């Protein structure tokens, strides 16, 4: 990998979440400077590119349209292949980036993909053959973190703040209701509601309950979410017999989840693959590696290829 440039969108923090209109405008403003910087860091010219890979979905349509339009224009101007990439496939395949692991991951592997928009358990048989074993039926785990953080008065995105405060808290301080789905699917809406009601009850007796016990509240809530994730991934591993287990997506940066997986790996014959932090949140490298494997297959999408807010896995 020659370069992996990212333009942050801190503009959303003031609104407590991503604002689609602001996101697409930021994409328009940043896309040219980011590409120029990427080429400069890589020390190559546009004419040396072999193909253009881009995200065509799923995601916010306005932002996707900016990237799709630019990618099509660039591929046409340079007369090189145009390769559309599924956003979630890219998260899963980020583990194939050359510098992702000291020992390369091998197929098959299970991938727990956890972010603000998705929670999925995926059986990865090859770069182009993947099967969803389970996914959330309502809210993603990243959203569960962010909504709880908002209730606690923490900045957006809330997940990293809960993670940081959890390190200083007691994970047994509070208990929250968790769903008990019989399969590999997830549900976090009930836990979010349980979290809200538990705090409301405590604050009736002690209005300063959150301030007095913030670290313990965060630690308890994070532990409850991780318990659900670990229960499902362990069940899927046992059922499939797959020995390689990976995580992906923004929540894969969570220190508690990473520690729980590493502890499981140390106590079993399971090989755990944790992505480097630069490959956890959305990044260009993961789109590049997913596009690379399609390039090897000779993929060259027509210029009529469109962005899609929702797209089949």
Residue ranges and their predicted role:
Residues 46-56, 240-252, 273-275:
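Short glycine-rich phosphate-binding loop at a beta-alpha junction
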Residues 54-79, 97-98, 255-264:
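Short Gly/Thr/Asp-enriched flexible loops that form oxyanion-binding sites at enzyme active sites
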Residues 85-109, 290:
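Conserved phosphate-binding catalytic cores of ATP/NTP-utilizing and phosphoryl-transfer enzymes
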Residues 91-94, 275-313:
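Glycine-rich phosphate-binding/hydrolytic loop that grips phosphoryl groups
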Residues 89, 125-170, 192-193, 197-201:
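Glycine-rich phosphate-binding loop plus the immediately following alpha-helix
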